Amino acid sequence: GVYNTYGYYFGKIHVDPSNSQKIYTYGVPILTSDDGGKTFYRIGKENVHADHHDLWINPDKPGHLINGNDGGVNITYDDGKNWIKNNSTEVGQFYAINVDYQKPYNVYGGLQDNGVWMGPHNSLVNKRWNMTGQYPWKGILGGDGMEVQIDNRNPNIVFTGYQFGFYSRLDLGSGKRKSIKPSHELGQSPFRFNWQTPILLSPHNQDVLYLGSNFLHKSINQGDDWENISEDLTNGGKKGNVPYGTITTISESPIKEGVLYVGSDDGMIHVTKNGGKTWNNISGNLPQDLWVSNVYASNHNEKVVYLSLDGYRWDNFSPYLFQSKNYGKTWVSISSNLPDSPINVVIEDNVNQDILYIGNDHGVYISFDQGKTWEPFKKGLTSAAVHDLVIQEEEQHLLVGTHGRSIYLADIALIQNHDIDNLLADIKIFDVKDVRFSERWGTKRSTDINYFTPSLKFSIFSKSSHKASFEIINNDKDVLFSQSISLDKGYNFIDYNLTILDDADIDLND
C-alpha cells in the first residue's frame, strides 16, 4: 500500500492533466509520484495541515497546486517544495465555545482537528500580526478541540480536551497540565465516550465537575478523582468504528444544585433532582432514537428545561425543539415556524425569560415568546452550521460558534430589554447616547487620511419591512438631516455622522 495510515472518506487520487506520469494521492498525508505510481513521496511541509480533502492542479503550469485540508488552504508553485498558507478566509469549524469574565473577556473554542484556542473578544480581524508577530489568539491544546469550561474564580484554570473524552485541567499561568479522563475499574467494561464528550463545571461549586461517558461522572476536586453517579444512561453500545450509546449533553439547573439533565446519542433523556441518587427517564413522549443535541436547564425557573433533537443522521431534517415546565415529565413542541434544519443548540436569555436562541445548520433564530414564534437572527452572519451559543452576561454579548465560518459576536443589550410595547408599536426608536463636541470634527492629520467624523448610532425596532423617512429635528422643529431608509422587520441600526442639510434654517452660532 501507499499510505501508512487510512485514507478515510476523503482519500482521493489525481493525475496531472499535463503529465500522465505525475500522480497525486491524499488522505491523511499528501503524496506524489513522478513515475506513474512506482514510487511515492510526501510533499506536505511544516505549515501544511494533515487530512487533505481536495486538490486543484493547474493544467497550464506544472507544480502549481491549491490544497484544501483540515487547516484551511495551502498554495504551492513548485510542486510542494514550498507552500503558502492562506489565512484570508475565516473557516474555523468550532464544536463548542465559551467565555470568561476578564476585562477584556476572552473567548475559547474547540475546533475540528485544530485544537483549542483562546483570544480576546475585541481583537480585530486584520493582518497587522504578520508585522508584529503578536497574534492575539493562541492555541492551548491540540487534537480535535472539544468543550471548554473555565473556573470563574481563577480564569487560568481551564478544563478542555480532545475527542473521545481525553480531557485535561490546564493551568495557563504555570503551564501545567493534568489528564482528568475517568477510568473504569478493573473487571468493568470500558466506558464509552462520545466524539464530543460533554463536560460541565457546576454553576454552584467550581470544584465540582461533571463528565459524560455512558455514565455520568462527578468529581468534587476538579477532576483529580471521579465517582459514577448514575447507571448506564443509554440504550447500550453498538459495534462500529466509533463508540455509540454515549452521553452527548449535560445541564445543571443554575437555580437548584443537584438538578441535572443528561441526553444521549440514542435519544435517551434522564433527570435527577438529588445529585444522582435517583434518576428518571423523561424521554417517553418524545420522538424516539434521535440524537440529543442539547439539553438546557432554565436560568429563571427551576422546573423549566429545553431540549433539541437531531435526526439528520437518519435523513430526517425536521426541527425538533421542546420545552418542559415540570422537570421533563411532559414536553411541548416549540419548533413552530422554524425551517426544516437540524437544531444543534438552544439557550435561554439570561435577562429575559421569554427570549430563546437556537442554532441550526443554517444560522441563528430568536423567539420573543418562549418558542411560540421564531424570527431569523442572522443579518451579517454567514450561512453556516451553528454548533454553539453562549452569552457573556456582563457585556451583553451573544457569541456564535459556527462549524465552518469561525465565531461571530452580537450585542444583545437592546434585545434583552425587549418588551411587549416594542412588538405592538409600528416603529420604536430607542434612546441614543449623548455626543460630546470635539474640535477634531471635520479635520484630518494628512492628505492620505480620511476626515475625522463623529458618529451616532440609532436603534429602531420596526414591526414590518418597509421604506421610511429618517429625519433629525432640533428643539425648534428645524429639519437638520433627512434621508430615505429601508427598515427590516425587527431591529435596525442606523449610523448618523452628525452632518446637517445645506439649507437647514439654523444658526450654528447658537
What is the predicted role of each segment?
Residues 1-444, 453-454:
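Beta-propeller blade termini and top-face loops
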Residues 18-20, 255, 465, 501-504:
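Extracellular acidic loop/turn motifs
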Residues 168-170, 456-481:
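Beta-strand-rich binding/interaction modules
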Residues 187, 446-448, 484:
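Outer-membrane beta-barrel proteins
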Residues 201, 460-462, 498:
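Hydrophobic beta-strand positions in extracellular immunoglobulin-like domains
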Residues 430-433, 463, 473, 486-488, ...:
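A structural detector for beta-sheet-dominated domains
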Residues 441-466, 493:
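Contiguous beta-strand segments within globular domains
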Residues 479-510:
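Glycine-centered tight-turn motifs at strand-turn-strand junctions
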